Amino acid sequence: MLGQFSPGEPYTTSLSSTPPWSPANQFQLFRFRSRTEPIDWRRLSTLDVDRVARDMDVSVLQDFIMTVTFCALEGERCPNCRGPVDPSLVKLLRMSQLSTEYLLQCQDFLSSQLAGLEERLQAATSLVQQGEGQRAELEKSLQETKQENRRRKQLIATQQLLLQASANNYHKCQFCEKSFVNYSYLQAHVQRRHPEVTDAEKQKKRKVEEMEDGIEELKEKLRLTQMQLQEEQQADNLRRQQEQEQQRRREQSEKEALERWKEDERRKFNQEIADLRQLFLQESKEMASKSSSIEAKLLVLQNKEMAGFNNASLQQDSDPEKEMRENRERELRERIARKKSEWRRKFQEAQKRHQQENKELKSENSRLLKALSVEKNSTSSVQKLQQQVVSLSSQLSQKDRLIKSQEEKIKKLSATPVPVSVVSLNDQDSSEEPVEQDRDSQEDSDEPQWKAPKIRKGKPALMRESKPILEESLEQKLENMGLRKGTKGISKQTFKSLSSLLAGQRLQKFRQQTNLQSLRDSLTLEVTRRVKSLQKSSGKPTPNTLKQRGKKTSTPLNEKSLRFRQDSKASDRREKSQQPKTLLPTPTPRSKAPPPNQTPKILAKKNSTPPFSSDEESVEDTAYITSSRGNLSSSVRVVQSGSLLNPTTEPDWTDSELSEDLDLPKIYKTCNPQGSVVQTLTRSLERQLSTPIKTPVGGTRVLPPSSTTPRPAIVKQQALSGEESDSELSSIEELTGRRAGGHKSLEVDRTSGTSA
């Protein structure tokens, strides 16, 4: 049957020269058959195709393969409608039949080929078995031959021994072919027939003896030299052992000193932590007592105010005011709850960041200690590692102190309640409101306004787009200089090496561009001239008046030109002249802006808060919450003390806040790690509580009165060294200068905008 393999069929083409599986032979013999098989529709209807596919029943397929392949479908009609079969379906079925027939032919062909290959495999297997038998026979004969060869060799060896024993009875002359029975005859023959050989032999023997004597002398000298070398080697080994012992003792003493120093530092650190914890607890108790007293007074005032509103004539007017006050209190409580959750989240983030930095510093410390144990022979490397360990431990202690100060600030700000003022609606309040707002706007207008238009004219979108580009270029330059990304500080040795590298690059660029200094001077003069002309034309104060005031900052271009002109001696004189100024407390007048190197310390100007609306929730991280823009009756300004000093304050996601993030390292530098941040916050809060407040007519004072006056702010001026004016760091200085200037000007614009 077609498609089935019968093993009994002869396979005659297996030994032919032409391969039996060639396509030419296959297609010459293959022809499509006619379709004459009948269709058993009943049997086909009882067939379960899904079961056949699921069980892979090949026998059922083998039964139906001939019927499906060679059936005629042209005359078949539908049993229901007796209509002819669709021609397209007939074509499809015929193509499937032809494909199946071709596949059956391929199956038969492959089956025949498989049978031939099996026969050839059997023949090859029989040949291999015959070869194995022959090989076994050959191996057996080889073993017998080897044994015979071994016996023959033994026989030949015994015969050679016998022949050599018989030949030793004769003494053959070395110079001719004669042999003698006795050795005396041989010597007489040599002396008689070969006299020249005997003289040469004597001379040779004499020379050999002389050479042997010289060799003996040389051996004696070599022995003495080896003994001396051994003695010297022993002395050298002893000296090396002594040096190693001394080095080991020195390293042991240094390690003990390092351990003692680490123990002392750890003890000091624990003592400082305990002192700071005690200080924080004491200050938190004081703040809690103050807040409780303020809340008690607030409740008393609220009770008094509520008692005044119980009159029958004002009953109708007090209902909307009461609802408004309740709404404000509810909004304030919700806002305080949000604040607490945000502070708690930031506190956890700061703790995680601190733990990660602590782990990094510990891993760096362990790596340095391992390097210290490996490099035992170099005392200089040990000193360098000790310096690095000291710097890392100091950084770790500073980080811990900063984290502690942040925790205390978070606790204080979360524990401090925000007072709510009970305000009565009177005609006098509404009439006094514009007067107070005008007074505030006049007080805020005392701030320098010559920086504010610059920020108003600026494009925030352009600033947002240029900021990541500048930051990326700065990070690339720092990485090219050898500083890894995320580095928060460098050691003195790294600073010295980078300074020498920058000095060399600066000198090289200066040699490449000889006209750099003249171009710089000309640009400086041109910029100064244009600034003076613009200031004169606009009526703004000139740099001379700013210099006389001593508080307003010049433009970044003027600062850069001044830095380019100053040399190292001038910077030293400026530092010496400014050091006594930094120690004296100087008042900060309203009409002068703080310099860019100072940490701005903004005090509360007015205790008036607007109604809490959604428009004013974006200013939680700034120093001021702006006053109301509407025509409401009264307003109280809430001041968050220490918000400028707190680096983990909630971001406002504005351009001004993005510029404030760049000034955080300066704030960290100005903060004293011994808890001075907490003390500064406490003093500022006490000053705010003790500052006299102007209340509108009909308003109620919610804070206790105090007779203390605010202390003058201590201004810390930082001197810039003249060595930072190189061309490589110019982009860094411009970037930091612009951001610092933008930060200060944005703060000025914000304070002036609150009064508008």
Curated annotation (Swiss-Prot):
InterPro entries: DZIP1_N, DZIP_RILPL, Znf_C2H2_type. Pfam families: Dzip-like_N. Residues 10-19 have a biased composition (Low complexity). Keywords: Cell projection, Cilium, Coiled coil, Cytoplasm, Cytoskeleton, Metal-binding, Zinc, Zinc-finger. Residues 1-20, 193-212, 233-262, 310-365, 409-466, 531-626, 693-756 are annotated as: Disordered. GO terms for molecular function: zinc ion binding. Disulfide bonds: none annotated. Residues 586-598 have a biased composition (Pro residues). Residues 534-558 have a biased composition (Polar residues). It is found in: Cytoplasm, Cytoskeleton, Cilium basal body; Cytoplasm, Cytoskeleton, Microtubule organizing center, Centrosome, Centriole. GO terms for biological process: cilium assembly; regulation of protein localization. Residues 193-202, 237-262, 319-335, 344-365, 560-578 have a biased composition (Basic and acidic residues). A zinc finger (C2H2-type) spans 171-194. GO terms for cellular component: centriole; ciliary basal body; cytoplasm. Disruption phenotype: Embryos show defects in otolith formation in the inner ear, but no other overt morphological changes. Belongs to the DZIP C2H2-type zinc-finger protein family. This is Cilium assembly protein DZIP1L. The lineage of its organism: Eukaryota, Metazoa, Chordata, Craniata, Vertebrata.
